[in-house]
Design a protein with these regions (language model features):
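Helix-to-loop junction immediately C-terminal to a conserved catalytic motif
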Residues: 68
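ABC ATPase NBD Q-loop/coupling interface
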Residues: 77-97
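Q-loop/switch helix immediately C-terminal to the Walker
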Residues: 108, 115-130
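Conserved ABC ATPase "signature" region
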Residues: 125, 137-154
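Conserved ABC ATPase signature
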Residues: 158-162
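Hydrophobic anchor residue at the start of the ABC signature
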Residues: 172
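Catalytic Walker B motif of ABC-type/P-loop ATPase nucleotide-binding domains
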Residues: 183-187
Length: 263
């Protein structure tokens, strides 16, 4: 059985979408404790590389989880347009298709099952086998992922032997197992030094994938080699700026300055 059954089946010669369009229509999310993670937001995201910046608690993670279907909006709607198909990431009927379409990266978090495997190659193999990917395809994909993400020399090492930098890379590899069209990444370089950040960022943006990611690293989003197309600045669960990365960083700097002046 190939990796894309149904909507994105490779057996019916339907290719993986080159990109998707996320649409939020008056979407909001309120947590059980009453805190609003995202206020009513109307937004369309279809650029190749979109950065989301903001202070802790500004709503970045809430927004990304609404995009990848981990959260369902309290009000309003979130949809994903992939070719001629429209999916609702928070709905039960579209959940499997959304999981095939979107790869989720959460910092350096990897599935718990990876720590029970003898080594990371076997961990990736088991992860794909559980999703009914054929053996030949699994082996080809494992080799490709490990090479692309500079993990080949670690293939026979257990996950808990990896340093933080390579766990970040392994988290990306895990997210790519189903050959998704888009990666939604929450702080994919968090906690790394300058060298580690550059290594992970180069690997992430070298992939032939649409990427929506949250970060505190304003230098990274303006580096020309990463070709970030667009940046959103969030504050208090609201989008305060939507435009070029350079202008977003300026808006972010001004926001922090105003907060300090009020303190």
């Amino acid at each position: 059985m190939d990796i894309f059954s149904g909507l994105f089946s490779r057996r019916d010669n339907t290719p993986r979408p080159d990109h998707v369009t996320f649409t939020l229509a008056q979407a909001s999310y309120t947590y059980e404790d009453g805190n609003t993670g995202l206020h009513d937001t109307t937004l369309t995201l279809d650029t190749r590389r979109t950065a989301v910046i903001g202070l802790n608690g500004s709503g970045k993670t809430t927004l990304l989880k609404l995009l990848d279907g981990s959260l369902t909006p309290t009000s309003g709607s979130v949809t994903i347009c992939a070719g001629e198909h429209t999916l609702y990431p928070g709905s039960c009927k579209d959940r499997k298709r959304v999981e095939q379409l979107i790869g989720c990266v959460r910092r350096e978090e990897i599935p718990n099952s990876f720590y029970r495997s003898e080594n990371i190659a076997k961990a990736l193999d088991a992860h794909m086998q559980a999703r009914h990917i054929a053996d030949a395809e699994r082996q080809a994909r494992i080799g490709s992922l490990l090479a692309q993400l500079d993990l080949s020399v670690w293939r026979d090492r257990p996950a808990d032997a990896l340093d933080s930098e390579h766990r970040h890379l392994l988290a990306i590899a895990a997210a790519l197992c189903l050959d998704p069209a888009v990666l939604v990444a929450d702080e994919p370089t968090k906690g790394l030094d300058e060298i580690g950040t550059a290594h992970v960022a180069r690997a992430l943006f070298a992939l032939d994938r649409q990427v929506v990611f949250a970060t505190h690293d304003t230098d990274m989003i303006t580096r020309p080699e990463y070709a970030i197309d667009r940046a959103l600045l969030l504050d208090g669960g609201r989008i305060m700026f939507n435009g070029s990365p350079q202008d977003a960083v300026t808006a972010y700097t001004n926001l922090i300055r105003r907060m300090r002046d009020r303190a």
